[in-house]
């Protein structure tokens, strides 16, 4: 800690307080995340230290990963600080700022670039068996060159995803996969792909795709667009803990109507991401090969 000087508190992240800080020797500005531990007296779980050290190795090996770089891990007085490169703009703020200029949509080429970088970052981490579990526009940071990077990758597995954040707001459900909402105990990389699909649609539409205000409202908002799932479209769905046979039966809508300004290739990719059955949801690796993203290779 003695190498860093805190400049100001810049936010309350999913896992704790985030500070802007300066490295005393180099003068480099960084973001320091103070990880809040559920049981302060227990200290930092060794599994968490191992996970985060692995994350740092992953980060170091390739700076083209579209993941925010983890620069340092500080462990002092039963507190854990993670030091990341400092990026002060996230995708939510970016989209809000565009709205303030009176623009009704993001430039389609920019949506394409951001979606490529998002899928590329997710693929990089999935290929190393790391799942994010909490992707949302606030977790996607934009650097000075206008490139999108993923923050907080790998932290969910180490620390869990809390139901509330530090200001006690409920963590957003808008990007949460249906298998998680319906109580599945086993989930995999598909949860991130669902979130990517929701973010992708939001960039095109300029409004959230499934803005639920409770878990059941979120589930119903998904059903109203994609139709109420059954065993035919999603084998095993009726066995999930929170599935109810009394759910209203909605018919699937045409995604072209839900995302009216999406071009054909974009809707095709979106459809492959928003598949109910996680086993048939497109992988990040395959998504990179789709027509919509092919220009960026």
Curated annotation (Swiss-Prot):
Where, per the database record, does this protein carry Phosphothreonine? 14, 167
Q: Which residues bind ATP?
A: 10-18, 33
Q: Protein kinase domain spans which residues?
A: 4-293
Q: Which domain of life is it from?
A: Eukaryota
Impact reported for residue 212 to S: Arrests in G2 at high temperature
The UniProt note on how this protein's activity is regulated states:
Phosphorylation at Thr-14 or Tyr-15 inactivates the enzyme, while phosphorylation at Thr-167 activates it.
Question: Catalytic center at which residues?
Answer: 134 (proton acceptor)
CDD domains membership: STKc_CDK1_CdkB_like
User: Which terms does the record give in the GO molecular function aspect?
Assistant: ATP binding; cyclin binding; cyclin-dependent protein kinase activity; cyclin-dependent protein serine/threonine kinase activity; protein kinase activity; protein serine kinase activity; protein serine/threonine kinase activity
Query: Any one cellular component term from GO for this entry?
Result: meiotic spindle
> Which of the seven top EC classes does this enzyme belong to?
transferase
The protein's annotated catalytic reaction(s) are:
L-seryl-[protein] + ATP = O-phospho-L-seryl-[protein] + ADP + H(+); L-threonyl-[protein] + ATP = O-phospho-L-threonyl-[protein] + ADP + H(+)
Q: Which Pfam families match?
A: Pkinase (PF00069)
Residues annotated as carrying Phosphotyrosine in the record are 15
The answer to whether the entry has keyword Cell cycle is yes
Q: Which InterPro entries match?
A: CDK (IPR050108), Kinase-like_dom_sf (IPR011009), Prot_kinase_dom (IPR000719), Protein_kinase_ATP_BS (IPR017441), Ser/Thr_kinase_AS (IPR008271)
One of the GO BP terms on file: G1/S transition of mitotic cell cycle
Q: Does the keyword Protein biosynthesis apply?
A: no
* Family per similarity comment: Belongs to the protein kinase superfamily. CMGC Ser/Thr protein kinase family. CDC2/CDKX subfamily.
Oligomeric state and partners? Answer: Forms a stable but non-covalent complex with regulatory subunit suc1 and with a cyclin. Interacts with cyclin cdc13. Interacts with cyclin cig2. Interacts with cdc37.
This chain's function reads: Cyclin-dependent kinase that acts as a master regulator of the mitotic and meiotic cell cycles. Required to drive the G1-S and G2-M transitions, and initiation of premeiotic DNA replication and meiosis II. More than 200 substrates have been identified. Substrate specificity is in part regulated by the bound cyclin protein. When complexed with cyclin cig2, it drives the G1-S phase transition. When complexed with cyclin cdc13, it drives the G2-M transition and initiation of meiosis II.
The name on file for this protein is Cyclin-dependent kinase 1
């Amino acid at each position: 800690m003695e190498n860093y000087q805190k400049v100001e508190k810049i936010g309350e992240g999913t896992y704790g307080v985030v500070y802007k800080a300066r490295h005393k020797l180099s003068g480099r500005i960084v973001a320091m995340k103070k990880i809040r531990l559920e049981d302060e007296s227990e200290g930092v779980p060794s599994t968490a230290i191992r996970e985060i050290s692995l994350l740092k190795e992953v980060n170091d090996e390739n700076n083209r990963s579209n993941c925010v770089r983890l620069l340092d891990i500080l462990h002092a007085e039963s507190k854990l600080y993670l030091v990341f490169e400092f990026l002060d703009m996230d995708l939510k703020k970016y989209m809000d700022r565009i709205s303030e200029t009176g623009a009704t949509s993001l430039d389609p080429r920019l949506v394409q670039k951001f979606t490529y970088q998002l899928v590329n970052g997710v693929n990089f981490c999935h290929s190393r068996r790391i799942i994010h579990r909490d992707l949302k526009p606030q977790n996607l940071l934009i650097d000075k060159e206008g490139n999108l990077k993923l923050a907080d990758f790998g932290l969910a597995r180490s620390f869990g995803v809390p139901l509330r954040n530090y200001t006690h707001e409920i963590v957003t459900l808008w990007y949460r996969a249906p298998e998680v909402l319906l109580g599945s105990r086993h989930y995999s990389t598909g949860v991130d792909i669902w979130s990517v699909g929701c973010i992708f649609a939001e960039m095109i539409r300029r409004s959230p795709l499934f803005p639920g205000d409770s878990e059941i409202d979120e589930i119903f908002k998904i059903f109203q667009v994609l139709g109420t799932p059954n065993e035919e479209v999603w084998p095993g769905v009726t066995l999930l803990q929170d599935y109810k046979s009394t759910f209203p039966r909605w018919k699937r809508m045409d995604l072209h109507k839900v995302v009216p300004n999406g071009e054909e290739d974009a809707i095709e990719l979106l459809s492959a991401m928003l598949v109910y059955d996680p086993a048939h949801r497109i992988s990040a690796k395959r998504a990179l090969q789709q027509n919509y993203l092919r220009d960026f290779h």
